[in-house]
Amino acid sequence: MPSTPWLPPQAAAAVRAAVLEAVRRYHRHDVLIDAEPPREPVLFVGNHGFGTVTDPNVLAVAASLRQRARQQTYLVHDMAWTLGVGGLVAAFGGAPASEESAVEAWTHGRDVVVFPGGDREAGKSWRDRNRVMFNGRSGFARLAMDHDKAVVPVVTAGAGEGAFVLTDGERLASAVGLDRALRYKVLPVSLSVPWGLSVGLSGLLPYLPLPSKLVTAILPPMRPAAGEDAAGFAQRVEDAMQSRMDDLVANRIPLLG
């Protein structure tokens, strides 16, 4: 599944820097560091806003980690490779979401970044825009436990306001076989730029998010408690992220921040 990056490293770095600077300006992005991450390679765990690889939350996390000495590998849904854009994802540090990809990154001294909510969180409706939704997924916690890596939660508020999602379209995705063809379980019905009212387009394809203010908080590192299993650890991470999200949006005005 891994593919050759479409861009040479220097070109990819230049494009990445330009995009992240654009995100900082367009979204008036603020970064709050609740605690400095450990110096050694870690597992950063983020939440989705809306969309897949073009989700502003993914870009916000990348922008938040720009000054870190280590590079990051982003674990990405294999749909990117199914659709033939794996080379583009790889050029910007993406790799198929697997234990093998994570271990390879850590072996080379890179951090790993994962968004456990996956497609369901990335396609959530407007009413759920401020919810962290891992849907019982605990693979990331097991990964960190098996390889003795700290989990560093990263929470971003605001990206769910970049489009108006009427419904996640989970039943529709199942009806048309999207879950079987691409392992993608939602087909959002949304209003977005440039797609207007669409079914699935702004979830699967790039869209121009509205200029909502983004705020990212980097939380203190977390490790499993004595006797805690992966499910319990994952739930504790999700709860910590939701608590921080609640703080970030307590007095928030949509789009304005």
Regions found by a protein language model. Name each.
Residues 1-101, 169, 203, 246-257:
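Membrane-anchoring hydrophobic helices of lipid-metabolizing enzymes
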Residues 2-15, 104-257:
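Non-catalytic C-terminal accessory region of glycerolipid acyltransferases
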